[in-house]
């Protein structure tokens, strides 16, 4: 049975995440106005977003993404290592997190820091998480996808409820410094998403530079880049049979859910996400 770090009723994997760090993030960490924060629920495409943002910052030059690990370029604030790196870093910081809104640094909400929040169809998040967590030693293994569907719908998974995570962070969607992105839109029109991020960050890139960002952030290139594919961490034996990047597709859940599982999921989704405008989510 894997160890969990429990904080405010939510389980986190114990690999590099301590209660002390989570408390420090929540109550002590000071967000600076020039920081850029990348947020998403786990298995929503966070690393793809990091890669795109890093390449925008270098105008498509791949040297940085090919020589520095992705968790050093944009440290995970809830990890012990990431937190220590971020509090020592001078100047603008690139910060990544899967934390729910109520556990994030309170200082964010009085700062002018920019936030990019990435959302993915929770059904695909679920299937991706089922394979990822199930093939690692970080989380309890479900005996079937059906069991994992039950856990997910109740929020009994690492980082807690998808529904609560989304509802809370989306309350910021009208803020000027908040950019909402959907994984499905990123897949459908990656260049359009890259341009949207450039506009949000006030970055002007030439057409050839945009092409380089697109090229070096592709799924295949990322999968082969040891600085971005987490192969260096895989060697620590926390993952047994699967890499971080499995498919990266849209709609894979249809190959896994039974009709009754899909119906049960739809029922909970409608209940939990009531109140959002029609057409809010691109997968509806």
From Swiss-Prot:
It comes from the Eukaryota. One of its GO terms (molecular function) is sulfotransferase activity. Induction: Induced by estrogens and suppressed by androgens. Expression is under the influence of pituitary growth hormone and thyroid hormone. 3'-phosphoadenylyl sulfate binds at residues 43-48, 120, 128, 183, 217, 222, 246-248. It is found in: Cytoplasm. It is an enzyme of class 2 (transferase). GO terms for cellular component: cytoplasm. GO terms for biological process: 3'-phosphoadenosine 5'-phosphosulfate metabolic process; cellular response to vitamin D; cholesterol metabolic process; ethanol catabolic process; response to activity; response to insecticide; response to nutrient levels; steroid metabolic process. The keyword Lipid metabolism applies. Pfam families: Sulfotransfer_1 (PF00685). Keywords: Cytoplasm, Lipid metabolism, Steroid metabolism, Transferase. It catalyses: an alcohol + 3'-phosphoadenylyl sulfate = an alkyl sulfate + adenosine 3',5'-bisphosphate + H(+); taurolithocholate + 3'-phosphoadenylyl sulfate = taurolithocholate 3-sulfate + adenosine 3',5'-bisphosphate + H(+); lithocholate + 3'-phosphoadenylyl sulfate = lithocholate sulfate + adenosine 3',5'-bisphosphate + H(+); (24S)-hydroxycholesterol + 3'-phosphoadenylyl sulfate = (24S)-hydroxycholesterol 24-sulfate + adenosine 3',5'-bisphosphate + H(+). The active site is at 98 (proton acceptor). PANTHER family: SULFOTRANSFERASE SULT (PTHR11783). Belongs to the sulfotransferase 1 family. Sulfotransferase that utilizes 3'-phospho-5'-adenylyl sulfate (PAPS) as sulfonate donor to catalyze the sulfonation of steroids and bile acids in the liver and adrenal glands. Mediates the sulfation of a wide range of steroids and sterols, including pregnenolone, androsterone, DHEA, bile acids, cholesterol and as well many xenobiotics that contain alcohol and phenol functional groups. Sulfonation increases the water solubility of most compounds, and therefore their renal excretion, but it can also result in bioactivation to form active metabolites. This is Sulfotransferase 2A1. The gene is Sult2a1.
